[in-house]
Amino acid sequence: MAKEEGTSVEPRQRKKQRTSGSQEAKAEKIRRTPAPERAPKYVSFQRFAKIVIGCLAAVISGMMHVFYLSAYHERKFWFSNRQELEREITFQGDSAIYYSYYKDMLKAPSFERGVYELTHNNKTISLKTINAMQQMSLYPELIASVLYQATGSNEVIEPVYFYIGIVFGLQGMYVTALFVTSWLMSGTWLAGMLTVAWFLINRVDTTRIEYSIPLRENWALPYFACQVAALTGYLKRNLNTYAERFCYLLLSTSTYTFMMVWEYSHYVLFLQAVSLLLLDIFSVEQSDKVYEVYKVYIFSLFLGYLLQFENPALLVSPLLSLVGAFMLVKCLQLNGKKGTFVAKVIKVFEFYLLCTLPVTLNLIVKMFVPHKENEHVLKFLEVKFGLNMTKNFTLNWLLCQESLQAPSQDFFFRLTQSSLLPFYVLVLIICLLSMTQVFFRRMSGKSKKETVTLEDGRIGERPEIIYHVIHTLLLGSLAMLMEGLKFIWTPYVCMLAAFGVCSPELWMTLLKWLRLRTVHPMLLALILSMAVPTIIGLSLWKEFFPRLITELTELQEFYDPDTVELMTWIKRQAPVAAVFAGSPQLMGVIKLCTGWTVTSLPLYSDDDLLQRNENIYQIYSKRSAEDIYKILTSYKANYLIVEDAICNELGTTRGCRVKDLLDIANGHVVFEEGDKLTYSKYGRFCHEVKINYSPYVNYFTRVYWNRSYFVYKVNTVISFQS
């Protein structure tokens, strides 16, 4: 029996020895085989080639976007075949105001004189001197005018093409920055190309450049995209010193520039600062970097405060309060042995301070700093979230604006049709679950690995991923309330979704949860990170590329003959010193096309201008001719322009027409239960004044009309007929 056992065991032992012997032989052979000398150089060359190809792809993507915008703009407006007046009419509303100041700077006899006229402007709005540089953030127009004259471009290109070219160039930089951000997060420039594809396909929801070129956001968001790209690189682990310094420098310059070109930039940066604060709480090892970024915020705020002529809105901004509270907590930070009960109590106390100190600091600052700039924003938010009810015309008019309403179902349908929304939700869920898993691992006291490899499958441990997930959730939550914010959120949806489907680490995280046995998870993750974006790209190419080509080949026409005729009449017939009154949007076009003084402008950061707008809009209410005359003469208006589109507005949403909002504000309709109806014995002014009977003809004389506009001269001498 023993012998049998011996014979049965012996073959197994020999087999084991043979196997171990062969492994040792292979290992010895590998050790003795000299490593090829060119391997490190080859790896360096491969990495260098990858970076060069990725950078070229990023730049080419940006340039292609610029060429596409230029071609589409030409096809839509026939810009090269238009006269100067017809070109300028394409700048509607507040966009017209910005471009008009660019023209004024080019006409100024000197740079100093031009800046002085901007900062002490009394030729735009009657009876009012404004600092246009501060109120409208006109640094882009100032710099564009300087570049146009300094480079000698006036001999080569028309001013309007130079201006549009700069904005289109910034849009190319915008796309390039999104490309780089997605590349940095995923490690492959394939993600950048998918980001650009989704951005272009969903451009109705990613940018407003096609509708209004001079908008502040079209100047500002490209710098914000550069700032986010720099921040993404700065937050990455194992970054060498030179790369970290470069990212920090780019972060500083882009943050400051972003703050200077858009008056609402500090609100966007506040959301980013909250995201970084949560990152600091979630990922302790990034605390020093978060502190450095906060230093950039505070430097940009104070430098912006000085260069924006001591703009009080920056001092009372929530961003400054949050940054100040964070730095104060860091100075008072107590040390406790990690993991002890005392350390946990200290952490809870610090979190409490970070929640309460910003509010306290903001209230203290507002006690000493006059801050009319933010009052209308707070009132609007109160009404928006149902905390208050109001009959105020301005607030209700703002609430009726499409950009300040909740997104429509069409928005979600478009994102789903391009496959963007489903993949974004998938990536977001995986990242959130991984972050939750990592959080509970740390709460349970498990040690964190210094370097996370692909095989670990922990996408939620990377600080830049944590930041982006938190940031996109905050932006997305607000975009669900106000559609205008989708133009900030949707580009980052494109970037995050593209990063996810192209990231082997994200697929590895998912596969480790599924615990597949048939295929090696790492191999499958690498295959999926290349196959899935390729399939998405091919499907997008097949479905949407023909549409993009059709848009470029399809001839469109934008022509507004009535507005052209009105502007021509004003330039030929109206006195140079005349003052015009009408809707703020039309006044912006008049200021640009004619240069004449107006009574109001489409600006919503000045309480006096908001009140002016409401008063001038009374021409569409049920007020007497005498009331309207008193309002117009109080602003020294010489001419009144009634727009038929507003007077006879049908509107899809009842209660949001200008005349409805005026009736609510004036008490001529029932707004809510308990209201007393105030009967108006007068008809709607814009209708009655067209009939030409007394007393309207005593106060106003019609001097011009066409299908869309009726121009009335405000009589200086009133003769009443008996």
From Swiss-Prot:
The entry's keywords = Acetylation, Glycosyltransferase, Membrane, Transferase, Transmembrane, Transmembrane helix
Q: What is its EC number?
A: 2.4.1.-
Record localization: Membrane
Q: Which residues cross the membrane?
A: 51-71, 160-177, 183-201, 246-262, 268-284, 291-307, 313-331, 351-369, 420-440, 465-485, 487-507, 521-541
| Entry's Gene Ontology cellular component terms | membrane
Membrane topology designation: Multi-pass membrane protein
- Region annotation Disordered: residue ranges? 1-34
Enzyme group, top EC level?
A: transferase
Q: Where is the composition biased (Basic and acidic residues)?
A: 25-34
Superkingdom field:
Eukaryota
In this chain, where does the modification N-acetylalanine occur? 2
Q: Which InterPro entries match?
A: Dpy-19/Dpy-19-like, Dpy19L4
Q: Which residues form a coiled coil?
A: none
Provide the GO MF annotations for this entry.
Answer: glycosyltransferase activity
**Stored Pfam families:** Dpy19
Give the family from UniProt. Belongs to the dpy-19 family.
What is known about what this protein does? Probable C-mannosyltransferase that mediates C-mannosylation of tryptophan residues on target proteins.
By what name is this protein known?
Answer: Probable C-mannosyltransferase DPY19L4
Gene source species: Mus musculus
What lineage does the source organism belong to? Eukaryota, Metazoa, Chordata, Craniata, Vertebrata
